Amino acid sequence: MEQNISDELQEAFETGRWKVRKFALPNATKYIRDIDNITWAETGLIDAFGANRFFDEASQMIANSIYLFQEGFFDAAFYSLRQSIEISIGTLYLTANPEKLEKWKALEPGFESGKMVCFLKNNEPVFKDIRTKLPTFFKNLRTIQKKTNKYVHKQGFSSFYTTQSYSWSDHRENKIYSKIISDFEETVKAAIGAVAMYRLAIDPLPIILMDEELMMRSADFITQPYSEEFVAEYIGYNNIELYKQTNLYQDYKESILAHEKQN
């Protein structure tokens, strides 16, 4: 009986009354592979080791969004991308406030994303420094987040599933379809870049270890560096040069340069 119901639902969404048009995403495999840059960039810091689980979850949410989008559930896909960024914010907040972890696990209130961002901007020196030195990066991110929220909150007919079927008769369907794909690809790239940047608020090793001079003076870290291609596509070299001006990066660099090169 359950199998029959499942088959009926699948048929309804594939060809029947509730048909959802799937989206072609030629770069899906590339995005999935690129996310590995974040999962491999684990921090070894004892007081921030728990952040690894949060960044793994953020990466999972991005991967989920890519799958959901290709299946046609674009609003859920946009929501997953928004969540990937909020999860990253959450771990920065908890790393700065470890005493609040038990309350977070107990599902107590006070962990809304907006409140956590406000706290970090006003009280967490590393977070403040990064945002101050990379204003354009975060301004662009905010612009894309606002667009994402229109899909999540279903504002405007372009965020409706039914709009695609209603527009078929006047030949607007493909235009709407292409616009959703364009917006999603812009958002998935922004989400990957944002999560990667928030990871750099824990420690700068994913960037430090990209520098051969610094890498040869470094100890054996569990952290893997970001690839050149990853940085170029999702963060931008201009932004990385600005990031290198942060106190966090400079302190690590100075400490590592004090060590001799290793064979």
Residue ranges and their predicted role:
Residues 1-74, 79, 91, 101-263:
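A cross-kingdom marker of C-terminal helix-rich interaction/assembly modules
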